[in-house]
Amino acid sequence: MKHIRNFSIIAHIDHGKSTLADRLIERCGGLADRQMQAQVLDSMDLEKERGITIKAQTAALQYQARDGQVYQLNLIDTPGHVDFSYEVSRSLSACEGALLVVDASQGVEAQTVANCYTALELGVEVVPVLNKMDLPNADPDNAKAEIEDVIGIDATDAIPCSAKTGMGIDDILQAIVAKVPAPRGQADGPLRAMIIDSWFDSYVGVVMLVRVVDGRLLKGERIKMMASGAVYNADGLGVFTPANEPRDALAAGQVGYVIAGIKELQAAKVGDTITLEKKLPNNAGPAAQALPGFKEIQPQVFAGLYPTEASAYDSLRDALEKLKLNDASLHYEPEVSQALGFGFRCGFLGLLHMEIVQERLEREFDQDLITTAPSVVYQVVKADGQVLMVENPSKMPDQGRLSEIREPIVTVHLYMPQDYVGPVMTLANQKRGVQMNMAYHGRQVMLTYDMPLGEIVLDFFDKLKSVSRGYASMDYTFKEYRASDVVKVDILLNGDKVDALSIIVHRSQSQHRGRAVVAKMREIISRQMYDVAIQAAIGANIIARETIKALRKNVLAKCYGGDITRKRKLLEKQKAGKKRMKQIGSVEVPQEAFLAILQVQE
């Protein structure tokens, strides 16, 4: 066990994490030359394209250190984005060390800091690495100062390297051996292994990526999940070098995979502990308590997904089922909307997660989708004291029957160069943010705000990037539910509610948003043979209205002069016809209307 090192790489998007991983694998001869390709660990096309890592991957590498001893290095690749923070914390808790990769030309970014704090809280040894030293504008001294300032760890001996040219790779491997502690655990105690990640393979079922903490697991043993109590047979074990390599046993300190004939991903939850079912002569029996840190993931952002063709409902359901096999944090349930027909209400971890799910549905499963405006979960307290969680604006009870509505508040950390502090603060105040802290680190500023999640979900990230010319970065963590004056705004067409267009907003912005939506709808809905009234209402109060004028034929064209009563008769006749039409006609709401809600600019 003392020759094993488990480590992961922490880095902001585009700071060169996956390329560095490629170099480490190449240097240790993890793959034959013909199997080597760029970004070996990012197996999904979408991961390569967006340059982000979504699922955790691992590689077990053999490295001969300078003292001649061969070490087994387990690289656990972590997702870097704030939406996947739970997966990051699981990956990190499976390691004893982490390489903190910072782009020498850009310095420290928000998500790096968030993940680095997670690592420090878990007691992981952090080794700073300055990447992209081959760039002409690399500024290692400034990057070191930022690491010390912002994160507060000693960066004097940060390792300079360039993953692109391969410089400094040996120094990194040597530092891992020297600085990262060996795994602690009882090699002969009861088996405890943590699930770092799991994914679905159509051939063998669910594959679990595990880190064995105590004891050992032999092929063919009966294993038990401690969170659910389910029992399975460990049919296959092995390690990834990134290519998979079967083994007969996994011992304490090792990272490998377990295949146990599990049919659905729900059964293998990330963070759960695996132990043995019962004591037998050749093993130490089941563990008394699970490893700490497991929690069920709760979705934060909800949106409706509907097929553009009603006939595609079944294929959308199949696509969601298949996605769910590989993404346990995706929640969905069937939903019916008067305007859009049959579809699903889906829950996501955050906005990036939502975009990725949509993109994978469209790309891998050829689905054409309409997505309703994203909304967050509100806590609603009814007059009789009953507390409901409402994730869909159309399910919100009438204002009259409620005593209060609480909205989710998150703590947001914003990092930016000091030139952009003004515009960013203005933006945060517009979004009802309350400033909690402000700290200067060299040329970088860190602002901390408490802000409603509902405001962030709409377009905060895009706005933040535009007011800071792309330099600001952010991450957020859920804080609490707080009572707030939010109201539900309904959109009516000729007096009929269109459920999919309802929005929940703060009362101070309800007029403004209501007007904006109504004006947008007026541009989109085509003219009918009768007047169409578009209204925004809070309960029974109409707060905004636009009218689409009717198309009408000029019935007076054939009257030359003559009596006014003759003209009046023709006009009355036309009016009666329009009135009859209005009673039986219904207004078609085009698809663009639902997307327009998303684009209503502040």
UniProtKB/Swiss-Prot annotation:
GO terms for cellular component: plasma membrane. The lineage of its organism: Bacteria, Pseudomonadati, Pseudomonadota, Betaproteobacteria, Burkholderiales. This is Elongation factor 4. Its main location: membrane. Disulfide bonds: none annotated. Keywords: Cell inner membrane, Cell membrane, GTP-binding, Hydrolase, Membrane, Nucleotide-binding, Protein biosynthesis. It is a peripheral membrane protein. Required for accurate and efficient protein synthesis under certain stress conditions. May act as a fidelity factor of the translation reaction, by catalyzing a one-codon backward translocation of tRNAs on improperly translocated ribosomes. Back-translocation proceeds from a post-translocation (POST) complex to a pre-translocation (PRE) complex, thus giving elongation factor G a second chance to translocate the tRNAs correctly. Binds to ribosomes in a GTP-dependent manner. It comes from Verminephrobacter eiseniae (strain EF01-2).
